Swiss-Prot record:
Positions of the record's site feature: Cleavage (non-hydrolytic): 73-74
Entry's Gene Ontology molecular function annotations: arginine decarboxylase activity
Protein name: Arginine decarboxylase proenzyme
Lineage: Archaea, Thermoproteota, Thermoprotei, Thermoproteales, Thermoproteaceae
EC number: 4.1.1.19
Task performed by this protein: Specifically catalyzes the decarboxylation of L-arginine to agmatine. Has no S-adenosylmethionine decarboxylase (AdoMetDC) activity.
Signal peptide: none
The UniProt record lists the keyword Lyase: yes
The organism of origin for this protein: Pyrobaculum islandicum (strain DSM 4184 / JCM 9189 / GEO3)
GO cellular component: cytosol
Broad EC category: lyase
Cofactor descriptive note: Binds 1 pyruvoyl group covalently per subunit.
Reaction(s) catalysed by this chain's protein: L-arginine + H(+) = agmatine + CO2
Length: 126
């Protein structure tokens, strides 16, 4: 009789990402407010903030704001398209004690979309 041993694959990261629909257009253009939301999301998720950068893009349907926080554990990113009332959110963490879903939920609560999707993925290696 042959036995099979299951090897537990180590989880090296937790990735939460999603799309937000029906967000207030003015909020999606408010670079400073979006920066504050990302910074607070990092604190809520028990992540250690290293640096926050943001960019404002102008020009028709490509107009929007991107905010990216580098955290010791990985990153948080928001990208917005105000003309579509749409944003994407990406929270990735390698820290065992950080909670990317808490960061995602906070961002959603602040942007108040009419609807949103959320996805979760364990990042692991074999």
């Amino acid at each position: 009789m042959q036995t099979t041993t299951q090897v537990k694959t180590p989880i090296v990261g937790k990735h939460v990402y999603g799309e937000l629909y029906g967000v207030d257009e003015a909020l999606l253009r408010d670079e400073e407010k979006l920066r504050r939301i990302v910074i607070e999301a990092a604190h809520i998720a028990k992540m250690h903030l290293v640096e926050v950068n943001s960019w404002r893009f102008k020009g028709g349907d490509k107009e929007g704001v991107s905010v990216i926080a580098l955290v010791l554990e990985s990153h948080i990113a928001i990208h917005t398209w105000p003309v579509y009332n749409y944003a994407t959110v990406d929270v990735y963490t390698c820290g065992e004690h950080s909670d990317p879903m808490a960061a995602f939920r906070y961002i959603v609560s602040q942007l108040a979309p009419k609807r949103f999707t959320v996805n979760y993925s364990d990042r692991s290696y074999k």
